Amino acid sequence: MLIRKPYSIEATDIEVPVSFRQQPMNGRMAAMRRRNFLYGGLGALAACGQTEDSPQSTGSLERVRWRMVTSWPPNFPGHGTSANRLAQRLEELSGGRIEVSVFAGGELVPALEVLNVVSQGQIELGHSAPIYWRGQIPAAQLFGSVPFGMLPNEFNAWLYFGGGLELWQEAYAPLGVIPFPAGNTGSQMGGWFNQEINSVEDLNGLKMRIPGLGGEVMQKAGVLPVIIPVSDIYTALQTGTIDATEWVGPYNDMAAGLHEAAEYYYYPGWQEPSGTLECLVSMEAYNSLSDELKTIVRTACIAENDYILSEFNARNQRALKVLVEEHGVKLRRFPDDVLEVLRDFSIEVMEDLAAENPMSGRVYESYKVFATEIGAWLRITEGSITEARGSL
């Protein structure tokens, strides 16, 4: 497995080198201007992503050499290291028959072009998040995160036993891409702000980095949503290009240095109660595999989906303590009246999305029914147990 490493970040590290946190935005723009050149290079590399034996082969000689492009900075804690680990797991489970070279966002293609190059068959694998594909696949938002929606364990139950995964793959099929759940950040935080939020009026006019359905909800509240890659967030927040941002949770947010650029850290993360990461597989490349290697691809994604959720839950609680106790971050809860307004706006956004096209309507109906049913069960079980146990 080849992993590009401009710098090294161990999975146990919290801080990120200054070279990442303070990367100039114009450097990223220069990378974008090289886009045509990079895409031309993809064609020259096409021979690398080949299956050496026929699709029907089940023998030990079957070999594939694939490339994975991601939406994350190199080795970025959580997201980036998850992509590396998935590539390694594919190689190990296949006994070396699947070799994956990993390219971070911007190394081969821009971070937000991952879906496009996999769809075009130029790249075999992508590691990204459904929230970025609003323009290409409106229904994808419902697999990324739904404001005030299901938590990770509820979401996974819907995917595997409620028909969610079948709908997800049906939604992406017209683009020639097969999505698999390959990670979950867990429940996220509400974001970093350079001013206190005491009422809905305080949101009006703010420029905030917030993608997905959460961004559409915030827009209804008067916020100007901005979508920029993670590598640009720190500089944008520090220079005042944006007034606020949400990213993930304490572990990733501290790694990105966001506590150095904003004073207030808000919760709950109503906009992303469950943050899905996805492995995008070229349908053509996947169909060229033997049944055995197809099973290995699916199994590796399932394993990573579970593993990284556990990692985020473990690391986030430790990182939050460091942020508050050592860095003096001001932790704040969104006022109840603000959450109520945002919840009402969320329903409007979801209903508008469901009305856009039949696929979005089917996904939303399935999601909503399952969320209602499993929510009633979890309030009786996990919710009541958590409340009853107090502090052990």
Feature map (PLM): residue ranges:
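N-terminal secretory signal peptides
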Residues: 1-32, 43
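N-terminal secretory/targeting leader peptides
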Residues: 29-32, 38-155, 165, 170-392
